[in-house]
Amino acid sequence: MARVTVEDCLEHVDNRFELVMLSTKRARQLATGGKEPKLAWENDKPTVMALREIAAGVMDYSVIAEAEIVEDEPLFAAFEDESNEAV
């Protein structure tokens, strides 16, 4: 298992905040079994695997965005049928 450093990952993302957001989303994909790893899985935890993928340059927001499904729902759709009168 190769050691992953923040500096290795920052070569492929703009800042630490973006690194945290990207690695979190990717680790969740790997942990839930939704996506296959892009590198050989070396008995690492999903978070380490996500960081290894970012450090290798095979994972970025464009790959994550392809996998995300965003459904547009009205914020207050559940309350449309209720009246606004005070009780």
Curated annotation (Swiss-Prot):
Keyword Transferase: yes
Keyword Transcription: yes
Keywords for the protein's UniProt record, in alphabetical order: DNA-directed RNA polymerase, Nucleotidyltransferase, Transcription, Transferase
Reactions the enzyme catalyzes: RNA(n) + a ribonucleoside 5'-triphosphate = RNA(n+1) + diphosphate
Pfam families, alphabetized: RNA_pol_Rpb6
InterPro entries in alphabetical order: DNA-dir_RNA_pol_omega, Pol_omega/Rpo6/RPB6, RPB6/omega-like_sf
Biological process according to GO: DNA-templated transcription
Record GO cellular component, one term: DNA-directed RNA polymerase complex
SMART domains xrefs: RNA_pol_Rpb6
Enzyme class, spelled out: transferase
Top-level division of the source organism's lineage: Bacteria
Similarity-based family: Belongs to the RNA polymerase subunit omega family.
NCBIfam families documented for this protein: rpoZ
Purpose: Promotes RNA polymerase assembly. Latches the N- and C-terminal regions of the beta' subunit thereby facilitating its interaction with the beta and alpha subunits.
Subunit structure: The RNAP catalytic core consists of 2 alpha, 1 beta, 1 beta' and 1 omega subunit. When a sigma factor is associated with the core the holoenzyme is formed, which can initiate transcription.
Protein name, per record: DNA-directed RNA polymerase subunit omega
Organism from which the protein derives: Pseudomonas syringae pv. syringae (strain B728a)
